[in-house]
Each structure stands twice: as C-alpha cells, then as structure tokens.
Amino acid sequence: MAGAKEIRSKIASVQNTQKITKAMEMVAASKMRKSQERMAASRPYADTMRKVIGHLANGNLEYKHPYLEERDVKRVGYLVVSTDRGLCGGLNINLFKKLLAEMKAWSDKGVQCDLAMIGSKGVSFFNAVGGNVVAQVTGMGDNPSLSELIGPVKVMLQAYDEGRLDKLYVVSNKFINTMSQVPTITQLLPLPASEDADLKRKSWDYLYEPDPKALLDTLLRRYVESQVYQGVVENLASEQAARMVAMKAATDNGGSLIKELQLVYNKARQASITQELTEIVGGASAV
C-alpha cells in the first residue's frame, strides 16, 4: 500500500484538477448562454430563408437556376463544422463518425468526396484519416462572423458552379438542449424541395426585379451562407453545452476519487499507527 505522504500528494493533485474543471464548467456555462442567444437571434433569418427557398423549389420559375437542377452524382462536397478546442466529450467524434459512414456509402457507389473544414479538430482528424480537404478555416473564436466563413463556402460554390461537385452538404451539430446535441448532415445543393405539406399543395409564381438570374444568383448564395452560419452558431452552442457537461462530470468524478483516496489514506494511517503500537508493545515486552 502506498505511503500516507504519497496518498496526500495524490489527493492534493486531484483537488487542484477539480478546481480547474469546476472553473471551466462555470466558464462554459456562461459562454453557452451567450452562444444560445446568438443562435436564437440568427435562427429566424435562417428559417425564413429556408422557407423562401422552399417556395422557389416548388415554384414555376421562368429561369431555372443551376442550383435547382439535379445532376448525375460523381463527386459530393461537405462543409464540415467542428470545434477548435477539445474537452467537449464526444461532440466531434460522433459528428465525424456520422460523416465517415455517409462518405463510405458514397464511396461504395464510386462517388468521391471533397471536404471544406471549419474548425481545427475537423482539419486534424480528416487529414489523419486521408480525407480530401480542399479548404479550411480555424480559430474563429466564440463570436464567429459570416465574413470568416466566406472562404470555404466560396471554394465549394465555385466547385459546384464549375461542375466539379454535384451535391453540397453542411455537416454540424444541432443544438437541442443542454444535454442533447444531434449530429446532422443537411443538403444545400441542389436545392431540396420543401418537405412542408402546405407548400407541396401550392403552385408558386414570382415577379422578379431586376431580372430572375441576378436575383437568384444572389439569393441562393445568401441561402447557402445563412445555412452554414447557422450551422456554425448551433455547433458553438453545442460545444459549450458539451464542455459544461463534460467538466461537471470531471468535477464529480474528482470528488469521488478524493473520497476513495481519503479512505485509502485513512487505512494507511491506521496501519501505520497499528504498526507503531505493535513495535512499542514488543519493545516493552522485551524489556
């Protein structure tokens, strides 16, 4: 059994770690609230944009934009949103597993995949497994802006415009609540028809100003950007929630470990005292 001094050292070490994880839990809780506010503020715009685009997909358009037309699939692209930091449980790996399963399904059909990464954890993971990373952005911090995302989005849209991609998806964690974050893969292009039953029963027509091509070119790009940005802010809220839960679990586990070590320490101290008493009694008997 380890000596009492060594056990006391271990207890002190765990207590110090527990203080760190408790502080990180509190910081994550504060950041999560701010991330939720940012996510809630951007959701109405993203949802409304999705509805407008859903109208377009079900509409009788006088100009058929390339983003609305299905193609034979030879190569697909993914805009993958991950975190820049760790200590957030299985948030990233669950997302990566889901994406790898879908990429394997495409590969089995002879379809290749390109990846545009948002977040350093995704970059390091997919570089390690041999993914074809064509664009990346990292270090956006806790308050990302749309301008920081333009690079990867532009690369993927250009590839789609040039016919080098036939489908485009955004991959991120959807924030449900503090205890639940769901990895999601959402098709961006070609524009999926709305699943709203009311929209399917209606026939939509539009008047365009100045002209359909100019308007749709801008609107559809804004749609892609808005969905990617929403994925980023949802993923950020998911990250802080997962980190808060992970740090709380670490703090609680630290408390349990301290109790176990305290019990071992008490036993070691008791054994030491018993041994000393035995030696004293033995010495007295010898005299």
UniProtKB/Swiss-Prot annotation:
Q: Which Pfam families match?
A: ATP-synt (PF00231)
**Which species is listed as the source?**
Klebsiella pneumoniae (strain 342)
Q: Where in the cell is it found?
A: Cell inner membrane
Q: Which CDD domains match?
A: F1-ATPase_gamma
Summarizing the function annotation, the protein's role is: Produces ATP from ADP in the presence of a proton gradient across the membrane. The gamma chain is believed to be important in regulating ATPase activity and the flow of protons through the CF(0) complex.
What InterPro entries does the annotation carry? ATP_synth_F1_ATPase_gsu, ATP_synth_F1_gsu, ATP_synth_F1_gsu_CS
Q: What is this protein called?
A: ATP synthase gamma chain
User: Is this entry keyworded NAD?
Assistant: no
Cellular component terms per the entry's GO annotation: plasma membrane; proton-transporting ATP synthase complex
Would you identify the family this protein belongs to, as annotated? Belongs to the ATPase gamma chain family.
Q: What is this entry's stated membrane topology?
A: Peripheral membrane protein
Name of the gene encoding the protein in the UniProt record? atpG
What is said about its interaction partners and assembly?
F-type ATPases have 2 components, CF(1) - the catalytic core - and CF(0) - the membrane proton channel. CF(1) has five subunits: alpha(3), beta(3), gamma(1), delta(1), epsilon(1). CF(0) has three main subunits: a, b and c.
Q: What's any GO biological process attached to this entry?
A: proton motive force-driven plasma membrane ATP synthesis
**What taxonomic ancestry is recorded?**
Bacteria, Pseudomonadati, Pseudomonadota, Gammaproteobacteria, Enterobacterales
Q: Which GO terms describe its molecular function?
A: ATP binding; proton-transporting ATP synthase activity, rotational mechanism
Q: Which keywords has UniProt assigned to this entry?
A: ATP synthesis, Cell inner membrane, Cell membrane, CF(1), Hydrogen ion transport, Ion transport, Membrane, Transport
